[in-house]
Amino acid sequence: MQNNRYRLRYLPLFYDDLNQKLLYISDVLHNIAAANKLLDSVESAIKERQFMAEAFEPYESLCERQHPYYRIYVGNFVVFYVVIDEGEAGKVMEVRRFLYNKQDVEQKIW
């Protein structure tokens, strides 16, 4: 059986988004357990999607993009990623943003 796993790449902006949310939960809300649980859930969701990154409906953006965005819902948050075909090197699942689901997404992923 062929391994169809996409290579993973994370943008620094994703890490900034994630760290901001985790610090808020752990330091402001004083809930370290919830922050750790969120981190584990995000990591698991991304790893699960790595095998089928293009099997889900693309996000309908208001502007045309070279690579369509896909979403992974994790509780009240959304992970945004794109798939980039790098030819013989294979396909990359590039994880770009981690946003609260009530944020103005179009403004954040522009």
What is each model feature region?
Residues 70, 74-110:
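Enriched for short, Lys/Arg-rich terminal
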Residues 1-41:
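Arg/Lys-rich, positively charged N-terminal/basic patches that mediate binding to nucleic acids
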Residues 13, 42-49, 72-80:
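A short, hydrophobic secondary-structure junction motif
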Residues 30, 47, 51-55, 77, ...:
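Generic structural signal for secondary-structure transition and capping sites
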Residues 34-38, 57-60, 64-65, 86:
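Solvent-exposed interaction patches of small proteins and small membrane subunits
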Residues 4, 65-68, 89:
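Residue-level preference for short coil/turn positions at secondary-structure junctions
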Residues 22, 43, 96-99:
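Conserved protein kinase catalytic domain
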Residues 46-72:
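A short, surface-exposed loop/turn module that caps and links secondary-structure elements
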